[in-house]
UniProtKB/Swiss-Prot annotation:
<keyword id="KW-1003">Cell membrane</keyword>
<dbReference type="InterPro" id="IPR010780">
    <property type="entry name" value="DUF1375"/>
</dbReference>
<keyword id="KW-0812">Transmembrane</keyword>
<dbReference type="GO" id="GO:0005886">
    <property type="term" value="C:plasma membrane"/>
</dbReference>
<keyword id="KW-1133">Transmembrane helix</keyword>
<keyword id="KW-0472">Membrane</keyword>
<dbReference type="Pfam" id="PF07119">
    <property type="entry name" value="DUF1375"/>
</dbReference>
<feature type="transmembrane region" description="Helical">
    <location>
        <begin position="4"/>
        <end position="24"/>
    </location>
</feature>
<feature type="transmembrane region" description="Helical">
    <location>
        <begin position="48"/>
        <end position="68"/>
    </location>
</feature>
<protein>
    <recommendedName>
        <fullName>Uncharacterized protein HI_0650</fullName>
    </recommendedName>
</protein>
Length: 70
C-alpha cells in the first residue's frame, strides 16, 4: 500500500504544476485558469499532466483575483 502511495505521489509531483509554470513565465501575462489550459495542452503531447489537472484547477481558482487584477 505504501509503494502505491509513493508511486502516485511521485507521478503527481513529476507531472509539474501547470499553474506554477504559467506564473513564473515572464513572457506571458497570467490569465484565468492558465494552469488548466497549460495542463490540457501538455496532456495532448503526453498524458501525465492530466493527473495535475485537479490541483491546477484549485490553485487557479485561488489565483482568480490575481488574474483579474492584471
Amino acid at each position: 500500500m505504501i509503494k502505491i502511495f509513493i508511486f502516485l505521489t511521485a507521478l503527481i509531483v513529476l507531472s509539474g504544476c501547470g499553474s506554477v509554470v504559467k506564473l513564473i513565465d515572464p513572457t506571458e501575462k497570467y490569465t484565468a485558469y492558465a494552469g488548466v489550459a497549460y495542463d490540457l495542452e501538455m496532456a495532448q503531447q503526453w498524458g501525465l499532466p492530466i493527473l495535475d489537472l485537479p490541483l491546477s484547477f484549485l490553485l487557479d481558482t485561488v489565483l482568480l483575483p490575481y488574474a483579474w487584477a492584471q
